[in-house]
Amino acid sequence: MRIPPRLVALAGAAAVAATLIAGPVAAAAPASHAVAASSAASASVKAVGRVCYSALPSQAHDTLDLIDEGGPFPYSQDGVVFQNREGLLPAHSTGYYHEYTVITPGSPTRGARRIITGQQWQEDYYTADHYASFRRVDFAC
């Protein structure tokens, strides 16, 4: 069984908190690099868009529930690393994103709909067009 990425993220957050309590680390990127990285991430996030959780198809709700429960998932490909080859999501190292199928009723295949999860809490993206566009799920609406 795969460990859902958001559980790994919570463990990582605990490790970061422990490190911060123990003392700061004196290693930081030069300011020019930090600004460039921040600008690139902001531009990418703006290109993604948002979608209200309530506006998602019911099958996307089912997929998000399965992710939170750790499965079982309907397809063996569910939970695999999403490579972000399109470069539409914010840039992160390989393994940061994972993809899950959103079942498309009547489709003989997995269809085009997916949920992509990041490692942050509620960092979920929906695509209805097989990675041509993404919308971050807004759980507040």
From Swiss-Prot:
Record's signal peptide: 1-36
EC number: 4.6.1.24
UniProt superkingdom: Bacteria
Coiled-coil stretches noted in the UniProt entry, renumbered to this chain: none
Catalytically driven reaction(s): [RNA] containing guanosine + H2O = an [RNA fragment]-3'-guanosine-3'-phosphate + a 5'-hydroxy-ribonucleotide-3'-[RNA fragment]
Membrane spanning stretches: none
UniProt GO cellular component terms: extracellular region
Gene3D superfamilies: Microbial ribonucleases
Keywords: Disulfide bond, Endonuclease, Hydrolase, Lyase, Nuclease, Secreted, Signal
Main location as per UniProt: secreted
Compartments where found: Secreted
Gene this protein is translated from: rnaSA3
Record SUPFAM superfamilies: Microbial ribonucleases
Gene Ontology MF: a single term: ribonuclease T1 activity
Name of the protein in question: Guanyl-specific ribonuclease Sa3
Recorded family membership: Belongs to the ribonuclease N1/T1 family.
Location of the active site: E99, H130
Disulfide bond sites: C52-C141
